[in-house]
């Protein structure tokens, strides 16, 4: 069982570290002819409050199908109660590797092969990363 630290700062760093460590795993891989290489560079990880007014603004701008943190929490955990200010949203960005950016910058009509691979295999990794974050938070 993974022990989540009590202090907010420690918990933030613990979650960031869990995400970062997973990106160092073999799951973060592009199967290229030249061999496997990481699909993504080190992730950028951020947090926001569940009651951030931007979520309501997104809903107004995007449409009623956009779920606020409170709405998705209630749909996912119908028996649990949590106020919006008790929720934290975890977000991450998986930056393209320098080599992918370089290869793609040389292309004029179609994406570079490495970029196309990162689109497919990188998104597969992103799904696994989401599952991993859920797993460690539930432990």
Q: Model-found features: residue ranges?
A:
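Signature of the catalytic double-stranded beta-helix
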Residues: 119-139
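Non-catalytic, usually N-terminal nucleic-acid engagement modules in DNA/RNA processing proteins
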Residues: 2-122
């Amino acid at each position: 069982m993974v022990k989540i630290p009590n202090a907010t700062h420690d918990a933030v760093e613990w979650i960031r570290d869990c995400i970062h460590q997973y990106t160092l795993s073999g799951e973060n891989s592009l199967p290229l002819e030249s061999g496997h290489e990481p699909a993504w560079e080190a992730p950028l990880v951020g947090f926001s409050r569940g009651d951030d007014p931007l979520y309501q603004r997104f809903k107004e701008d995007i449409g009623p199908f956009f779920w606020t943190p409170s709405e998705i929490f209630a749909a996912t955990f119908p028996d649990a109660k949590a106020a919006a200010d008790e929720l934290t949203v975890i977000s991450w960005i998986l930056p393209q590797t320098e080599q992918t950016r370089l290869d793609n910058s040389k292309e004029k009509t179609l994406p570079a092969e490495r970029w196309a691979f990162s689109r497919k295999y990188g998104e597969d990794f992103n799904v696994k990363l989401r599952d991993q974050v859920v797993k460690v938070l539930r432990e």
